[in-house]
């Protein structure tokens, strides 16, 4: 696939890693028969359609069609090039790549350099906080906020001195490229004279890590009333804030173990909650939750508890985040903090145990939260506002998938406002039908994933020749003698274009002396669509053995299909023929062909 990396090296890496371990870092997998299943990380779904085969070292999603091996998975989920995926797995497997291909590309070298600068800066900030007189202001602030040494060390918290050039001078003395330090967001270039100065000054520093645990950015919290209160690194080649969550790298083991994540608004909340024993907390990076962040959470947990500030802005953010998380298939709960406090303030005021027990432990269902949310700023003594509130709640109830839940909340509504339960049910059903109609319209335009699912279901109803080609190819990838028989009798005369291309590659693969191995074969394909189709075929559940009769039947079905097409063409032409002589000639052709086909 890539001429710069020897094929034997790629094979050594592939044999040295287990696809279950690689994918297991992104997807919660459960054993089902010989394979493992989970929710697809490439599209939102509620029912698992993503399958991983440890025997074949392949994965395939029966919903969106994504598939391949460990290299392909990293290419798709991380946006890696093939060489980057090889390098990542080589490090994991402790396989040394030839010097000429590692690092692979200039972009990769640049990103590694930027990360190394960030890692150095993090050590500098942490050193200043813990061991210098200049860090005393930061230490005092953190002590006042109740931060322990354990918290500071675990999250590698630091402090940026108040000087304009503290970090700049240290980097220069270490011969660090200051232009690269600027690209990483640590330094700012002054327009007047082009000189660089520190972006972070007189701030407590919170390192931000990517999914691999590498520091790629920082958040800085002012000690006083300076604006902005929180300052983040700008986006850079190694940092896109909509794709990362603060604390995710440290929290992921707990998230996966508990199958639950707690979503906070800020770094300090995550750190304070960690001290309180809530070790599965993450936070957005100063922006609203994004689809990619929601997907990242869903890949690792089914349940999400949203724990935002207890004010109106926090409730608004909770409502928006809940919608995104639900779309990704999360079960959402909401932790309500009283008195308008944020999580850190609550913990300082009432203690860690009470926070864990009374706030996180008593989380509301999302519907219960919405009933509180829609009351905000409303005077329910006013008839008009009361009716508007009831209508909004009925709309939310109509979205619930379980009849028991719908009935439960409708009864609550009926009792609270002395309304007829039957009337509420009728209104809820009317709204449900309208929503369903609107969804059907929008699905026809935008829901490509469901269309792909439908396409997959249709494969069960494929014509006999197409099923024959699929099953033969699945056997050919696993059995060289079957491939040899097919090559001798059929050659490459498959009727489906993709299958025809895969057959040609497969014959070439065996001609080079390779042993039957679907994963190795797929690794040598370059076309993404062929990789997808070949993976799907390799994942088919078939009997490992195929007898001569079955093999003959499949080959005959494939051979006969062009003749069936010709038969249909003759029948179609016969219906339109007006010349008696030509009609008789075509009729005889039809009779002869049917005899040949034994009809």
From Swiss-Prot:
Full protein name: DNA primase
* Swiss-Prot/TrEMBL domain comment: Contains an N-terminal zinc-binding domain, a central core domain that contains the primase activity, and a C-terminal DnaB-binding domain.
Q: How is the cofactor bound?
A: Binds 1 zinc ion per monomer. Binds two Mg(2+) per subunit.
Q: Keywords on this record?
A: DNA replication, DNA-binding, DNA-directed RNA polymerase, Magnesium, Metal-binding, Nucleotidyltransferase, Primosome, Transcription, Transferase, Zinc, Zinc-finger
Cite a single Pfam family from the UniProt record. Answer: Zn_ribbon_DnaG
What are the required cofactors?
Answer: Zn(2+); Mg(2+)
What job does this protein perform? RNA polymerase that catalyzes the synthesis of short RNA molecules used as primers for DNA polymerase during DNA replication.
């Amino acid at each position: 696939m890539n001429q710069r990396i020897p094929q034997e090296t790629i094979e050594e890496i592939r044999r040295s890693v287990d696809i279950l371990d690689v994918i297991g870092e992104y997807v919660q997998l459960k054993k089902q028969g010989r394979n493992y299943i989970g929710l697809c990380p490439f599209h939102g779904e509620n029912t698992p359609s993503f399958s991983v085969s440890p025997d074949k070292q392949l994965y395939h999603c029966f919903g969106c069609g994504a598939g391949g091996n460990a290299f392909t998975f990293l290419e798709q989920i991380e946006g890696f090039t093939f060489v980057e995926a090889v390098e990542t797995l080589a490090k994991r497997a402790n396989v040394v790549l030839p010097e000429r291909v590692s690092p692979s590309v200039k972009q990769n070298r640049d990103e590694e350099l930027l990360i190394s600068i960030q890692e150095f800066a993090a050590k500098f900030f942490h050193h200043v906080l813990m061991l210098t007189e200049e860090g005393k202001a930061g230490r005092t602030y953190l002590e006042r906020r109740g931060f322990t040494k354990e918290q500071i060390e675990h999250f590698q918290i630091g402090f940026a001195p108040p000087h304009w050039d503290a970090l700049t001078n240290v980097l220069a003395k270490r011969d660090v490229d200051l232009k690269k330090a600027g690209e990483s967001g640590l330094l700012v270039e002054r327009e007047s004279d082009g000189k660089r100065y520190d972006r972070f000054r007189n701030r407590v520093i919170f390192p931000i890590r990517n999914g691999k645990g590498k520091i790629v950015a920082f958040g800085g919290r002012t000690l006083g009333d300076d604006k902005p209160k929180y300052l983040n690194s700008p986006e850079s080649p190694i940092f896109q804030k909509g794709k990362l969550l603060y604390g995710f790298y440290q929290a992921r083991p707990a998230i996966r173990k508990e199958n639950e994540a707690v979503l906070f608004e800020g770094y300090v909340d995550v750190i304070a909650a960690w001290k309180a024993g809530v070790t599965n907390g993450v936070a957005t990076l100063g922006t609203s939750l994004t689809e990619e962040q929601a997907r990242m959470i869903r890949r690792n947990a089914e349940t999400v508890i949203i724990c935002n500030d207890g004010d109106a802005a926090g409730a608004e953010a909770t409502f928006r985040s809940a919608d995104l998380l639900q779309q990704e298939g999360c079960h959402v709960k909401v932790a309500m903090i009283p008195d308008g406090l944020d999580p850190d303030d609550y913990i300082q005021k009432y203690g860690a145990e009470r926070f864990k027990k009374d706030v996180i432990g008593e989380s509301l269902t999302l519907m219960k939260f919405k009933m509180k949310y829609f009351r905000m700023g409303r005077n329910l003594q006013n008839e008009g506002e009361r009716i508007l509130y009831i209508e909004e709640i009925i709309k939310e109830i109509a979205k619930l998938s379980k009849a028991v839940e719908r009935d439960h909340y409708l009864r609550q509504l009926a009792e609270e406002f002395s309304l007829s339960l039957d009337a509420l049910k009728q209104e809820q059903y009317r709204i449900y039908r309208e929503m369903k109609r609107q969804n059907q319209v929008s699905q026809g335009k935008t829901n490509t994933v469901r269309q792909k699912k439908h396409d997959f279901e249709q494969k069960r109803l494929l014509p006999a020749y197409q099923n024959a080609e699929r099953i033969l190819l699945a056997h050919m990838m696993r059995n060289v003698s079957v491939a040899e028989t097919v090559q001798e009798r059929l050659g490459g005369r498959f009727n489906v274009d993709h299958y025809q291309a895969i057959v040609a590659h497969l014959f070439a693969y065996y001609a080079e002396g390779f042993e039957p191995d679907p994963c190795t074969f797929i690794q040598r394909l370059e076309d993404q669509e062929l990789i997808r189709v070949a993976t799907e075929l390799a994942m088919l559940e078939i009997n490992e053995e195929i007898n001569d009769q079955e093999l003959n039947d499949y080959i005959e079905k494939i051979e006969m299909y062009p003749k069936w097409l010709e038969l249909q063409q003759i029948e179609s032409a016969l219906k339109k023929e007006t010349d008696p002589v030509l009609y008789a000639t075509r009729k005889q052709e039809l009779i002869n062909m049917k005899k040949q086909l034994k009809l």
